[in-house]
């Protein structure tokens, strides 16, 4: 994957860092198109084929939340690949220490949640609810972390 994108990686990294540090200059659609472009390069470089099903179930109007199970590290890339509308994410704050993810989250204007701080977590939830009601879309992995063994906890309905 790296060899196939050898010349793209420096350009893509610079552009992603620029968009992340100047996110307010670009519309959500422009930032999402950059992420889709980077995602497409990663998918093609890895000789992967993503076959999405159920896109007709994605609401036509903005202001919704995806609540998928977190199967593995490729989940968000697969969702970006098939989702036609921009979305942001709620992620654990520890991921801001990971290069590349830090820039992706800044570009998406993601909310970072501290799972050890209940007050901060509640404030993030309140802010996400306000943004969803204002028409922004979000992706939240409800069980909190990816499944390393394929077993997921039983989830119940969440009402906003």
Where are the predicted features?
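Membrane-anchoring hydrophobic helices of lipid-metabolizing enzymes
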Residues: 1-64
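Soluble catalytic domains of membrane acyltransferases
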Residues: 45, 49-158
């Amino acid at each position: 994957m790296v060899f196939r994108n050898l010349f793209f990686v420096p350009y893509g990294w610079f552009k992603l860092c620029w968009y992340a540090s100047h996110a307010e200059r670009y519309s959500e659609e422009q930032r999402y198109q950059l992420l889709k472009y980077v995602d497409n390069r990663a998918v093609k470089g890895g000789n992967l084929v993503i076959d999405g099903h159920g896109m007709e179930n994605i609401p036509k109007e903005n202001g919704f939340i995806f609540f998928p199970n977190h199967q593995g590290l490729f989940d968000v890339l697969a969702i970006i690949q098939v989702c036609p509308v921009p979305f942001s994410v709620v992620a654990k704050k520890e991921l801001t220490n990971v290069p590349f993810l830090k820039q992706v989250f800044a570009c998406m204007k993601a909310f970072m949640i501290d799972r050890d701080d209940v007050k901060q977590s509640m404030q993030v939830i309140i802010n996400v609810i306000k943004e969803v009601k204002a028409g922004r879309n979000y992706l939240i992995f409800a069980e909190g972390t990816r499944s390393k063994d394929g077993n997921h906890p039983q989830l119940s309905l969440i009402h906003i």
